[in-house]
């Protein structure tokens, strides 16, 4: 315990910087759909603009590592945070939808690149024996900070104020990193990913990663629109999203032990059933806001655990450890690729079916995942690795794609 505290203390500036970054990102991401809806933009157009974020993110996973390798982690963080902040501020000068879509792409590119910097630093710095405790602290920082960013929406700010405040947090995030000296890890060249081959090795994990990409990033980008279309304000939307994140965070403290004892497949089924039941109750409940707050807690608990359980399932199924990195990268890529379609899919459903088209998408996703999981076998307990859902289950989980080849073995989860 003392050792993990010393590591966290020594990396205090890094944790402070990432906290400021997550607050700024939470605000700028959650505000997009709300601001566009207030300006009278249609659901499909909102989905297209939000898709820009994930297009930028996918491009970032292909090219950003070159910038980091060339400039070093501290300078790369400064570069990407500056572009991130400027892109956030530029939203305030025009309401042109194409301009906003381009800016969202820049935001996605820079945010994923910044996570790549942060997480490679953590992986290089943290000793194996205390890794889970330090990364648990990192995850706490993420959920708390991102949730605070979303809650800022409840202050009834103007669009100009939202973008200035988010940019201020993002720009401030680079300052603490200039106060530390740390050996900067190397980021190697990318290697090709063979998705069909990976599906043959870890089918349930790959399907779970695809569902998680659609579900998690669809929630972050479109949940506020779901609440607004019911006639509520951005304040209620921010509470709805924050409660769901709290449910996701608390569920992860329980699901690890459950999946270690009973298996990843039963755990995936449990989370899928919880998500599905919550979705059905959303439809039966109608628009009662208090009930939706309660349901969002369980809804978040189900969807936010999907990706971590998929990773754990893959780790259990891999018999050839030389394939662990390739499998991990394939899952992360699948998660990211699915994210591209989540805003568009949900916005189209809401255009056709109204606000609850958002829920219909989750019904289809988790019915499909449940049916597929039922065709798979549970891995015997003696073959399971210790569950550790860290550094992956977040909006930009694919930031770890570019980590060095020892990442999977050090994490003992890929």
Positions of the model-derived regions?
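Cytoplasmic helix-loop-helix junction between adjacent transmembrane helices
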Residues: 105-140
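C-terminal membrane-cytosol helix-exit motif in multi-pass small-molecule transporters
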Residues: 153-157, 167-187, 369-377
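Structural signature of the two symmetry-related core transmembrane helices
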Residues: 75-90, 167, 266-281, 363
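Intracellular juxtamembrane helix-capping segments at the cytosolic ends
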Residues: 113-126, 304-319
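Helix-to-loop junctions at the C-terminal end of transmembrane segments
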Residues: 60-72, 153-157, 251-263, 350-351
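Paired small-residue
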Residues: 98-106, 290-298
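Intrinsic disorder in cytosolic terminal tails and internal cytosolic loops
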Residues: 1-6, 185-192, 376-414
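Helix-loop boundary and gating motifs at the non-cytosolic
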Residues: 4-54, 202-205, 217-230, 237
């Amino acid at each position: 315990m003392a050792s993990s505290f010393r590591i966290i203390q020594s990396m205090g500036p890094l944790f402070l910087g990432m906290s400021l970054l997550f607050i700024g990102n939470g605000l700028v991401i959650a505000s997009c759909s709300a601001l566009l809806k207030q300006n009278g933009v249609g659901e499909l157009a909102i989905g297209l603009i939000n898709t820009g974020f994930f297009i930028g993110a996918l491009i970032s996973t292909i090219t950003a590592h070159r910038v980091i390798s060339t400039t070093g982690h501290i300078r790369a963080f400064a570069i990407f945070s500056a572009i991130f902040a400027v892109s956030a501020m530029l939203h305030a000068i025009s309401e042109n939808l194409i301009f906003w879509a381009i800016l969202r792409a820049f935001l996605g590119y820079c945010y994923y690149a910044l996570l790549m910097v942060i997480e490679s630093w953590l992986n290089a710095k943290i000793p194996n024996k205390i890794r889970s405790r330090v990364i648990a602290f990192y995850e706490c920082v993420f959920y708390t900070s991102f949730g605070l960013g979303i809650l800022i929406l409840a202050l009834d700010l103007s669009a100009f104020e939202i973008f200035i405040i988010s940019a201020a947090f993002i720009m401030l995030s680079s300052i603490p990193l200039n106060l530390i000296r740390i050996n900067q890890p190397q980021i190697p060249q990318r290697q090709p990913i063979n998705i069909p081959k990976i599906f043959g090795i870890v089918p349930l994990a790959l399907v779970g990663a695809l569902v998680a990409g659609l579900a998690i990033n669809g929630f972050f980008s479109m949940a506020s629109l779901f609440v607004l279309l019911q006639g509520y304000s951005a304040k209620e939307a921010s509470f709805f999203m924050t409660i769901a994140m709290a449910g996701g965070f608390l569920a992860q403290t329980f699901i690890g032990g459950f999946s270690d004892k009973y298996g990843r497949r039963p755990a995936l089924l449990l989370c899928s059933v919880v998500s599905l039941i919550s979705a059905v109750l959303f439809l039966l409940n109608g628009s009662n806001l208090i009930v939706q707050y309660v349901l969002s807690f369980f809804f978040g608990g189900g969807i936010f655990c999907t990706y971590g359980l998929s990773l754990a399932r893959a780790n259990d199924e891999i018999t050839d450890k030389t394939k662990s990195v390739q499998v991990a990268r394939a899952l992360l890529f699948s998660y990211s690729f699915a994210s591209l379609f989540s805003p568009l899919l949900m916005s189209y459903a809401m255009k056709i079916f109204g606000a609850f088209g958002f829920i219909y998408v989750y019904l289809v996703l988790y019915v499909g995942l449940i049916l597929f999981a039922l065709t798979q076998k549970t891995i015997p307990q003696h073959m399971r690795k210790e569950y550790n859902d860290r550094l992956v289950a977040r909006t930009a989980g694919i930031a770890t794609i570019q980590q060095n080849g020892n990442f999977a073995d050090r994490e003992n989860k890929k």
